[in-house]
Amino acid sequence: MNLQAVSCSFGFLSSPLGVTPRTSFRRFVIRAKTEPSEKSVEIMRKFSEQYARRSGTYFCVDKGVTSVVIKGLAEHKDSYGAPLCPCRHYDDKAAEVGQGFWNCPCVPMRERKECHCMLFLTPDNDFAGKDQTITSDEIKETTANM
C-alpha cells in the first residue's frame, strides 16, 4: 500500500474586525493507494481469459487497457469481495456489489456483449486485438509505472 500525505492550508481572508489573523491551520490528509493482491490479479486474469474464450470476445489491442481493467477488478475483489466494474463511478460501491448489476461480467456484457471497460471486445470492434490471453508478466510490465 502506498501512502500519500497532502498538506492543506486554511487561512482566513478577513475577520469581523477587519484584521487578518497571522495564524493559519495546516491539516494533513493521508490517502491510501492500494495494490490488489497477486492472488486476486491472477484469479481475475484467468477469469478474463476464460470469459473471453467463452463469449467469443477479444482483449484490446493495447494490452495496457486490459491490464489496468484486470487490476481494477482484482482491487474491487479484494476490497468488496466481488469484481465490481472499475470503469464506473459509484456513490456506494458496497451497495452496487450487493445489487450485482455491475459485477463483472456486468449485465450489459452478458446480455448484449457491451463492455464499457473495453476488456471484452467483439471481433468487429476497431480496438479489438487478436488475443484472448494475457500473461501475469504483461500485466506487471504494462502497469509498473502506475
UniProtKB/Swiss-Prot annotation:
Family matches, as InterPro entries: FTR_bsu (IPR004209), FTR_bsu_sf (IPR036644)
Keyword GTP-binding: no
Residues holding [4Fe-4S] cluster: C85, C104, C106, C115
The enzyme's E.C. designation: 1.8.7.2
Disulfide pairings: C87-C117
Protein name: Ferredoxin-thioredoxin reductase catalytic chain, chloroplastic
Entry keywords, A to Z: 4Fe-4S, Chloroplast, Disulfide bond, Iron, Iron-sulfur, Metal-binding, Oxidoreductase, Plastid, Redox-active center, Transit peptide
Feature: transit peptide: 1-31
